[in-house]
């Protein structure tokens, strides 16, 4: 006798619907499950509307459409419900993924099951797929390898079905480690509203630069999620003492620890030092779920604050590949809420976030411990048609005096 689990799902157009599910235990040992076919997203029919986002010659208006182009840095592989019967699949990554499983979760059924299995998803891919549950009755694989059979469902209201992604791909494993939940997008509000006396304060970006920016922010988010960064951030006073010892000085140069936005009396070494609890809170401001608008400047200064963080074209094209993250770290700190009075933004007073993050970032490149370390995955530096400057292939070198190299001596890779 078939074991049926029935429950009610909310719908936009229907009052309720009873759904039947049967699991392995009700089928017997001889049941042979027939799962949905796997999908190669590099070879999709036109009905799936496959495309590559951020093609070099794509109109910039598309990347500036914040209703269509956005992602959270810890979820570069994005699955969004479209209407009551379809999903939009997008990958915000310069490198594709293999062996990707998209799981679904229904109300009142506590197990996730595989609704799509992609053998390949190419870089910056987007396509659309019908939710198989609306097509008819199917077998689905549960996380534990067992099978559940679900009857046809006519459609789903927003939020009635939840999607999540898993993959055995080593790149995806790095994505999963990212703690930051920043919502990343591009905004044209800055360059379209330049002041009359500074017409190049902000410059428009294009898909070539957007791809570099996306690559950089994923790497940056990984770096500030890294155990070495967290340990150094939480124990910044120890880091400063280690710097002094390495330099052979008896006293720490500048502030002894993190301090906030209040005006300081550096001459008398008076700072508004943060407590341990406040330092933990400060760390969370770097990784919370606020919106980040990435932009580009053309004037004498980069800018950050509120949702904005920006830098010059060179930072996007070559700088981040070489680990030159000082400007970006500074503006990202303004975006996270810190002023020039705080060493969380300011590089002065013996060094602060700008200096420490840059050293750490370079050490992670040295360890090959970022999601992306090869500038040739994009070759943005070669695409002179879309750039204002002329660039050579970025070549990374590490300073033998890098404090993380001195301390960890090639160890500390995230395992």
What is the meaning of each model-derived region?
Residues 1-9:
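Bacterial N-terminal signal peptides that target proteins for export
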Residues 9-12, 30:
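Short, intrinsically disordered, low-complexity terminal segments
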Residues 16-20:
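C-terminal motif of bacterial Sec signal peptides marking the signal peptidase cleavage site
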Residues 22-25:
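Bacterial signal peptide processing site
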Residues 28-324, 335-415:
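Predominantly extracellular/secreted Zn2+-dependent metalloproteases
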Residues 331:
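Walker B catalytic acidic pair
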């Amino acid at each position: 006798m078939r074991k049926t689990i029935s429950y009610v799902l909310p719908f936009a157009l229907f009052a309720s619907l009873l759904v039947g599910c049967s699991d392995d235990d009700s089928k017997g040992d001889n049941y042979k499950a027939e799962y949905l076919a796997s999908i190669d997203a590099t070879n999709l029919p036109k009905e799936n509307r496959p495309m590559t986002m951020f093609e070099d010659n794509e109109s910039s208006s598309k990347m500036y459409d914040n209703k269509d182009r956005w992602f959270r840095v810890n979820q570069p592989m994005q699955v969004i419900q479209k209407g009551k019967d379809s999903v939009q699949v997008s990958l915000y990554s310069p490198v594709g993924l293999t062996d990707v499983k998209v799981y679904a979760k229904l109300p009142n059924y506590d197990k996730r099951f595989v609704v799509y299995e992609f053998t390949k998803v190419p870089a910056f891919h987007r396509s659309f797929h019908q939710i198989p549950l609306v097509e008819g009755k199917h077998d689905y694989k549960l996380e534990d390898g067992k099978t559940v059979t679900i009857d046809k469902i006519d459609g789903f209201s927003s939020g009635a079905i939840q999607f999540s992604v898993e993959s055995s791909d080593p790149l995806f494993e790095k994505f999963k480690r990212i703690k930051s939940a920043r919502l990343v997008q591009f905004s044209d509000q800055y360059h379209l509203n330049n002041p009359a006396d500074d017409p190049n304060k902000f410059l428009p970006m294009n898909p070539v630069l957007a791809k570099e920016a996306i690559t950089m922010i994923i790497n940056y988010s990984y770096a500030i999620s890294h155990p070495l960064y967290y340990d150094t951030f939480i124990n910044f006073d120890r880091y400063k003492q280690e710097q002094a010892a390495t330099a052979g000085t008896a006293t720490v140069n500048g502030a002894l620890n993190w301090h906030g936005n209040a005006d300081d009396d550096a001459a008398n070494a008076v700072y508004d030092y943060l407590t341990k609890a406040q330092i933990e809170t400060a760390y969370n401001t770097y990784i919370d779920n606020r919106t980040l608008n990435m932009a580009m400047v053309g004037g004498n200064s980069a800018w950050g604050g509120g949702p904005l963080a920006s830098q010059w074209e060179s930072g996007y094209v070559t700088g981040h590949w070489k680990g030159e993250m000082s400007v970006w770290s500074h503006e990202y700190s303004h975006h996270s809420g810190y002023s020039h009075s705080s060493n969380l933004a300011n590089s002065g007073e013996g060094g602060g976030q700008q200096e420490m993050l840059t050293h750490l970032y370079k050490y992670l490149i040295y360890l090959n411990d970022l999601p992306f370390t090869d500038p040739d995955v994009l070759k943005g530096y070669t695409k002179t048609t879309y750039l204002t400057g002329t660039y050579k292939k970025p070549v990374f070198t590490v300073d033998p005096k890098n404090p993380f190299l001195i301390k960890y001596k090639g160890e500390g890779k995230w395992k």
